């Protein structure tokens, strides 16, 4: 992902304020609610029958935290996202058979959650930088599918 120095600074500055536990669970929960067909990949998570069940599900929260942990790692390797996400790409492609379009959906949901949490601090410029990053991460995760 090519970011200007200003974009990189905007992304890393805001990310330093992100509560990965909270935002990860919320982003994954929203993905499962807004795009309910994604729930089929999480059948082992138990009750996903209602918005309250999804958003309160400890397995959703734990996996969301794990997802954002990997995303954080990616932010430290923006110049090598394909290498950083190679193993996760292989896992999601070969073993889990996740449609790579879902990575784009989750990235867009994450941007919405960040906007919700940071309000005016999440300026259009910050959003543009994050859109570049989530697109790059989605592309890296989809790499093994090609």
Curated annotation (Swiss-Prot):
Residues 2-146 form the Globin domain. Keywords: Acetylation, Heme, Iron, Metal-binding, Oxygen transport, Phosphoprotein, S-nitrosylation, Transport. GO terms for molecular function: heme binding; hemoglobin alpha binding; metal ion binding; oxygen binding; oxygen carrier activity. The modification N-acetylvaline is found at residue 1. InterPro entries: Globin, Globin-like_sf, Globin/Proto, Hemoglobin_b, Hemoglobin_oxygen_transport. GO terms for biological process: cellular oxidant detoxification; hydrogen peroxide catabolic process. The keyword S-adenosyl-L-methionine does not apply. Red blood cells. Disulfide bonds: none annotated. The modification Phosphothreonine is found at residue 12. Heme b binds at residues 63, 92. The modification S-nitrosocysteine is found at residue 93. CDD domains: Hb-beta-like. The modification N6-acetyllysine is found at residues 59, 82, 144. It comes from the Eukaryota. SUPFAM superfamilies: Globin-like. The modification Phosphoserine is found at residue 44. One of its GO terms (cellular component) is haptoglobin-hemoglobin complex. Heterotetramer of two alpha chains and two beta chains. Involved in oxygen transport from the lung to the various peripheral tissues. This is Hemoglobin subunit beta.
